[in-house]
Amino acid sequence: MIVDKQSDSAISKRKFRTGEVMLDIKKIFSLMGILALAFLICGVLELSASPRKHIIVIDPAHGGQDAGVKLTGKVYEKDITLAVALTLRKELAKESNLEIILTRDSDKEVSLEDRRKNIAKIKPDFVLSLHTNAGFGKSASGFELYCPEFNKDFKKDKKTAKGDVRQEKNKYLNDSVRSARSIQENLNTLFPRKGRGLRRADLPITEDLFVPAVFVEMGFATNPEDKNKLLSPDTQTEIANALAKSIKSFYR
């Protein structure tokens, strides 16, 4: 029997090349798997490395039947606080590291108790409560700022040491004061010599809650000059921008 050595050689080469192709395909799939895994790991690492968003609660006082102080026949405190809050939310929403939540975003009545419950549920990093002032005669004018006293004991479990509670309380108070001072500085620029100081008080909105907070009285509805400013959409925007500047700088 005559063996065709040339044919055998050709067949061997075909088999070898086929093996090479199969090997190359396996390598390609292996590399694809490694790359896919690498992309997945990078995505997870990037996600885990993303900065946590700071939750800011803006509380426009009053709403609905609870109108607050009357400025004109048709405009009340509830309207001013909501207008400033909506503008402030729009400005702060530009910051990727902030999440903004309003206690109300329309002319609806939300009880103080419900506001506190919502804040307790949200557990924000900061609460800003907006109001307009009144009283003390027509001569009283300017803005006022308040920080929580945090006088009441923390509602902690028995395992929490008193030293830890005191340290946490001091942090909340310090953050509140620092935020208030920044707001005071920016509002002073807007309303020169109109600041009535920074005070500490038990704030209704944060009663039994321990969270950094500032209570802002934006001006006196009973003062003609203050009232005209509060009624001005331009001034409302300026107030919102001043507040936004303070919050941005604190949570930068």
Where are these regions (language model features)?
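Active-site-proximal helix/loop segments of hydrolytic enzymes
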Residues: 51-54, 79-252
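Sec/Tat signal peptide C-region and signal peptidase I cleavage site
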Residues: 45-48
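Bacterial N-terminal signal peptides
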Residues: 32-43
